[in-house]
């Protein structure tokens, strides 16, 4: 009985022990199975599928983006670089690796002059893992930073470069400028932006969870960018520099509001020099005023005044309604449609002569005579001649912002329009359009398209296209052109251009112009534009030269304020072309013979 009693309590304990052991085995087997599963899974993930999954994760971090091509350079006609792109870099900081924030900020501020120590210190203290602390940094600056070997500071090349302009003011109104990312904004940089910028490429780069590029990751090019074309301008840097200098002196001498000058090859239409005062430094375009950036040669339409009398003479001669022998009454005033027209009070009047021919009218710049010529030929002949010379149309010179000027249609003319248009009032034109018309007279009657672009050069430096002279149409006959050149020569030898437009050793020809400043449908009291346009040499012109001085003080007439600058430019251009002045013989005194 006692043995039976002792064995009875053991059975529940043994059962509990067996159950506990069973549970332990089950847990073991479950954990073992899970371990096997995890091990197998880990093997699959890390060994079998590892490379594939890593590649997929890498691809998820990749962004495919466009990147800019290298922007082309701008050269003058002789291959001198006026503008080119230099590589630029960004400066990044991995903030966690920067050991001395204050010292690093001070060191960087000594190189990145546009950043203050305080601003750099704040950037370096940001919680972001990396920050950009310098954008469009020059090669010299980035090299200097690299030499500092600052912990946490790295240099990363940028997709776009920085435009380098060696002579900041030279031809600034022609060249224009680009924005921060090399987008053309003005001048030929804007007009030919599509050629200069090239075709963008595609590349993949690593990005963070916010889509921002990781600066230190190596990008991979998918489609290579095509470098932009470089362009060769028709500009002659030597002429350009000196025309700017001469124009600046003239504007300052007469305390004028502004001025512009143009040198054109009449046989090809090439713009050899184009200057404006005031001007600006392309490298500091952001601080330049709109007036300083204005290209007056193509943008400013004005009443040409007496320089337009030659167009009236061209219309008269080419129509056959007036000949060189035709005589007009020499008088100082003429009343038409209730308006009295006077000759200019500049001392160049007809004197005691009772009649004058077309050459006299041009040489002495008589408004009344020009009005009589206009009335003789009629409005249709006058209008058609203006249109043949291209007035009222764009010249398509290749510069942005061109103004076509205003030539009213015949149905808009009043009773006084014909006589006033005949001496350059009641219409407007630009210096480039007027120079194109005079170039036609200089070259024998052909209207040439003026152009600023000479050639295209590919990324490897090969000239792939050279622009040829483009004849638009015949404006006048060669006979008429020759007669007009003789008239313009008379302006210099005995008219309003004497002696200011004379260049010793060379023959010059041209026309003076003086006009009131037209504004808001009327004329500004006391405000004038003095101009001179002509060519050299007179018999076989190589250069058409225009000088325009706006709102001068102390004198107003083109023969006074503009012709001397024309003469200086003409002499310079001829000598630069290798044409030496003709020898002017000194007076020889015959010795007295003894008798």
Question: Whereabouts are the PLM-identified features?
Answer:
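Beta-lactam-recognizing serine transpeptidase/beta-lactamase-like catalytic domain environment
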Residues: 4-11, 83, 208-222, 235, ...
């Amino acid at each position: 009985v006692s043995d039976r009693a002792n064995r009875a309590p053991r059975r529940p304990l043994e059962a509990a022990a067996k159950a506990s052991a069973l549970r332990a085995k089950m847990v073991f087997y479950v954990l073992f199975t899970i371990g096997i599963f995890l091990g197998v899974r880990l093997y699959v993930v890390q060994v079998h599928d590892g490379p594939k999954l890593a590649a997929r994760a890498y691809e998820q971090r990749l962004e495919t983006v466009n990147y800019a091509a290298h922007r082309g350079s701008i050269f003058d006609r002789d291959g001198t670089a006026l503008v080119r792109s230099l590589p630029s870099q960004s400066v990044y900081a991995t903030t966690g690796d920067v050991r001395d924030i204050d010292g690093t900020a001070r060191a960087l501020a000594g190189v990145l002059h546009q950043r203050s120590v305080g601003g750099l210190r704040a950037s370096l203290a940001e919680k972001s893992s990396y920050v950009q602390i310098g954008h469009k940094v020059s090669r010299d600056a980035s090299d200097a930073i690299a030499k500092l070997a600052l912990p946490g500071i790295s240099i990363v090349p940028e997709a776009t470069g920085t435009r380098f302009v060696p002579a900041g003011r030279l031809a600034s109104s022609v060249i224009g400028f680009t924005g921060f990312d090399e987008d053309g904004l003005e001048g030929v940089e804007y007009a030919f932006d599509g050629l200069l910028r090239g075709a963008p490429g595609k590349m993949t780069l690593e990005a963070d969870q916010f889509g921002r590029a990781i600066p230190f990751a190596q990008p991979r090019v998918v489609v290579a960018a095509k470098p932009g074309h470089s362009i060769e301008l028709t500009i002659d840097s030597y002429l350009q520099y000196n025309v700017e200098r001469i124009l600046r002196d003239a504007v300052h001498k007469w305390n004028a509001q502004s001025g512009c000058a143009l040198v054109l090859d009449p046989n090809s239409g090439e713009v050899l020099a184009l200057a404006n005062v005031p001007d600006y430094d392309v490298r500091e375009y952001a601080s330049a005023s709109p007036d300083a950036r204005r290209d007056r040669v193509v943008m400013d339409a004005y009443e040409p005044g007496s320089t337009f009398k030659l167009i009236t003479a061209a219309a008269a001669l080419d129509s056959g309604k007036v000949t060189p022998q035709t005589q007009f009454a020499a008088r100082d005033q003429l009343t038409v449609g209730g308006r009295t027209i006077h000759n200019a009070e500049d001392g160049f009047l007809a004197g005691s002569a009772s009649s004058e021919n077309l050459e006299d009218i041009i040489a002495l710049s008589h408004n009344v005579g020009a009005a009589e010529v206009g009335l003789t030929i009629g409005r249709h002949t006058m209008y058609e001649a203006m249109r043949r010379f291209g007035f009222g149309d764009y010249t398509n010179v290749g510069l942005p912002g061109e103004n076509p000027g205003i030539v009213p249609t015949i149905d808009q003319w009043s009773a006084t329009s014909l006589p006033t248009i005949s001496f350059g009032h009641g219409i407007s034109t630009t210096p480039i359009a007027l120079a194109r018309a005079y170039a036609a007279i200089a070259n024998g009657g052909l209207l040439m398209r003026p152009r600023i672009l000479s050639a295209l050069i590919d990324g490897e430096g090969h000239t792939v296209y050279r622009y040829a002279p483009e004849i638009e149409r015949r404006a006048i006959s060669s006979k008429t052109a020759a007669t007009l050149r003789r008239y313009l020569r008379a302006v210099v030898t005995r008219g309003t251009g004497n002696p200011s437009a004379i260049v010793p050793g060379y023959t010059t020809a041209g026309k003076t112009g003086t006009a009131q400043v037209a504004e808001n449908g009327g004329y500004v009291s006391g405000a004038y534009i003095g101009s001179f346009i002509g060519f050299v040499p007179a018999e076989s012109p190589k250069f058409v030269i225009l000088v325009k001085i706006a709102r001068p003080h102390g004198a107003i007439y083109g023969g006074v304020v503009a012709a001397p600058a024309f003469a200086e430019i003409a002499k310079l251009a001829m000598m630069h072309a290798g044409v030496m002045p003709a020898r002017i013989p000194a007076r020889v005194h015959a010795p007295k013979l003894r008798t």
